Amino acid sequence: MSYSVLEALRKSPEEVRKVLLARRVDASLVDKFLALDAKWRQLKKEIDELRHLYNQLSREGAKAPPERRREISEKARELAAKLEKVEEEVKELERQREELLYSFPNLIHESVPVCPEGVDSVPVRHWGTVKVSNAALQSLDPGVEYVVVEKEPVGHADMAEVVLQMADTLKAGEVAGSRFYYLFDDLVWLDFALAMYAMDQLAQKGFRPVIPPYMLKFDIIRRVLDFDTFKDAIYKIEGEDLYLIATAEHGIAAYLYKRELLEEELPQLYVGWSPCFRKEAGAGNRDLKGIFRVHIFHKVEQFVFSLPEESWKWHEEITRNTEELIRGLGLPYRVVNICAHDLGAPAAKKYDIEVWYPAQAKYRELASCSNVTDWQSYRLGIRVTRKGMKKEYVHTLNCTGLATTRTITAILENFQRDDGVVEIPKALRPYLEPIKAAPKEYIYPRRIKQQPPS
């Protein structure tokens, strides 16, 4: 089976046009591709005819009398020159066609919503009881369980920097720029514990722990993401053919670059830990305070290489895995189905898992889970040999395990007390227990005496 987008363009171009319109992408790409592809097919046919004629002349020349051989040889040379010229044209057309094919987003699953302007996702399910003030009750989704709080919660930025005094974005801004931070004391241990918790829980489910390269060559990075869209969002190393990864997904996807797999080698499950480097160029002035949206953070990532027929099962599975991690922390959340226009080019379907932030009175994204089908594997040349020696592109999937700094912000807003003390989720305590200097049950503001609460 060929690449699904290429196959759809040839067999049902109108369906691809509908996908592009749903994604709010220029649908004229279809016509440009079909024109190139038609010319390519025409020239391929011409090459076959020229080769046939050339072979015919060669056979004829071998049997011809000496007086005709020179004439036949001259015709053969002319044909060979023409063949070489057409083959060069085909190579150039293939380059142009491949470049154009790279600009196509993935096809979309039938369950992906096509949404009106101003709507980016559709809620699928909710979990947990949210803390909300009377003034914010109207902002809740229908059917969400809630408890009304009298005191307005403190936002995560003020909790970290003012109440706990364990983060400093002002000094980081002075020495590094906006969206950088210093993290201190118990929040450092919390960062480590969150990563260990996610890595451990997922490894127990059969995911292989991996720390991928933190930098990738241009030829690889352009294959794992939509480079034209994200080239201004990722960091390039000056003077080097290297880019800093925005997520462990990129390095893990590249691990099987140009691999031919057997059916029994799939699925392959990985849980990666890495720092993530992002320019956040499109964020503007959003979330400038605190550590919610920053240039570098640590993240645990699930990644799956799957047989094509099993990828939708795995999409639900990895989403449930992350839900279990968030439920284990006791954070109220919802799962939303992302609208077609907001999917991003690689994903055929994407769920976001959004956690409730009491001080903001809204859900904020904590994790994304995507089925990328064969969009990455086509670019990376990762195929599986099926029975009968048929080759297909594998499917790849990715899902956030936990992004540590963002999860810290959710913990600070959801588990704060009136006296500024923050309760540590019970699921994290086993990962803090072996570390003598780490907090065990509570994080106390630096200004108060650290005595267990009554």
UniProtKB/Swiss-Prot annotation:
Q: Which GO cellular component terms, listed alphabetically, does the Swiss-Prot or TrEMBL entry include?
A: cytoplasm
Localisation per UniProt entry:
Cytoplasm
Q: Which reaction equation describes what this protein catalyses?
A: tRNA(Ser) + L-serine + ATP = L-seryl-tRNA(Ser) + AMP + diphosphate + H(+); tRNA(Sec) + L-serine + ATP = L-seryl-tRNA(Sec) + AMP + diphosphate + H(+)
* UniProt cross-references to CDD domains, sorted A to Z: SerRS_core (cd00770)
Name the Gene Ontology biological process terms: selenocysteine biosynthetic process; seryl-tRNA aminoacylation
Biological or metabolic pathway of the protein: Aminoacyl-tRNA biosynthesis; selenocysteinyl-tRNA(Sec) biosynthesis; L-seryl-tRNA(Sec) from L-serine and tRNA(Sec): step 1/1
The record ties this protein, via Gene3D superfamilies, to: Bira Bifunctional Protein, Domain 2, Serine-tRNA synthetase, tRNA binding domain
Q: What class of enzyme is it?
A: ligase
Where ATP is bound, by residue? 278-280, 294, 365-368
Question: Which Enzyme Commission number(s) are on file for it?
Answer: 6.1.1.11
Molecular function via GO: ATP binding; serine-tRNA ligase activity
InterPro entries (UniProt xref): aa-tRNA-synt_IIb, aa-tRNA-synth_II, aa-tRNA-synth_II/BPL/LPL, Ser-tRNA-ligase_type_1, Ser-tRNA-synth_1_N, SerRS_1_N_sf, SerRS_core, tRNA-bd_arm
Q: Which UniProt keywords apply?
A: Aminoacyl-tRNA synthetase, ATP-binding, Cytoplasm, Ligase, Nucleotide-binding, Protein biosynthesis
Residues binding L-serine: 247-249, 301, 400
Q: Which family does it belong to?
A: Belongs to the class-II aminoacyl-tRNA synthetase family. Type-1 seryl-tRNA synthetase subfamily.
What does it do? Catalyzes the attachment of serine to tRNA(Ser). Is also able to aminoacylate tRNA(Sec) with serine, to form the misacylated tRNA L-seryl-tRNA(Sec), which will be further converted into selenocysteinyl-tRNA(Sec).
PANTHER family reported in the protein's UniProt record: SERYL-TRNA SYNTHETASE (PTHR11778)
Q: How does it assemble?
A: Homodimer. The tRNA molecule binds across the dimer.
This chain belongs to which protein, by name?
Answer: Serine--tRNA ligase
Originating organism: Pyrobaculum calidifontis (strain DSM 21063 / JCM 11548 / VA1)
